[in-house]
């Protein structure tokens, strides 16, 4: 059975009910999908950065997402060695990756999850990562 780590951009589309992400999650099984605590932090930043008129609705959506994934939000504490290895490698080959993307990618690698992202190019230089784009035409 395939298991998946949903990148932040996929969660944003889920929260906005876009691109059939909710249906794709239902198809693979909600329990087969995980989030990184980095994604949660990025979503919280998005809420803090949103217009005051949208903030309460965004908080509700975030809270619902948190409940849905309550026991499937993965910590980064056990992926730090993989993060460091991947960061050194992408620096060595001259293909830098953003810090949060590195942590999310390392989480997918360590847990043996396929990373679902709209931005596959951001992760393609990580060794051993498996990627899927659920939004690609």
For the regions a language model picked out, list residue spans one by one.
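Residue-level recognition of specific faces of alpha-helices
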Residues: 24, 37, 82, 122-125
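Acidic active-site catalytic centers that drive phospho-/nucleotidyl reactions
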Residues: 7-9, 101, 119-122
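A generic structural signal for short hydrophobic patches within well-formed alpha-helices
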Residues: 11, 40-43, 123
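Acidic, PIN/NYN-like endoribonuclease modules and their adjacent C-terminal/linker elements
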Residues: 105, 109-137
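Active-site neighborhoods of divalent-metal-dependent phosphate/nucleic-acid chemistry enzymes
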Residues: 45-48, 71-116
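Short, well-structured N-terminal submotif of metal-dependent ribonuclease cores
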Residues: 1-36, 48-64, 68, 137
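Residues at the C-termini of beta-strands that transition into short coil/loop
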Residues: 37-39, 77, 119, 135
């Amino acid at each position: 059975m395939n298991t998946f780590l949903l990148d932040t951009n996929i969660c944003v589309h889920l929260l906005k009910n876009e691109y059939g992400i909710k249906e794709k999650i239902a198809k693979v099984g909600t329990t087969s999908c995980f989030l990184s605590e980095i994604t949660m932090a990025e979503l919280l930043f998005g809420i803090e950065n949103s217009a005051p008129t949208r903030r309460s609705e965004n908080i509700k959506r975030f809270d619902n997402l948190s409940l849905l994934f309550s026991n499937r939000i993965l910590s980064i504490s056990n992926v730090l060695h993989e993060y460091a290895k991947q960061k050194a490698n992408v620096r060595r080959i001259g293909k830098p990756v953003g810090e949060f993307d590195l942590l999310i990618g390392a989480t997918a690698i360590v847990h043996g999850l396929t990373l679902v992202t709209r931005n596959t190019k951001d992760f393609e230089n990580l060794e051993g990562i498996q990627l899927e784009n659920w939004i690609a035409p």
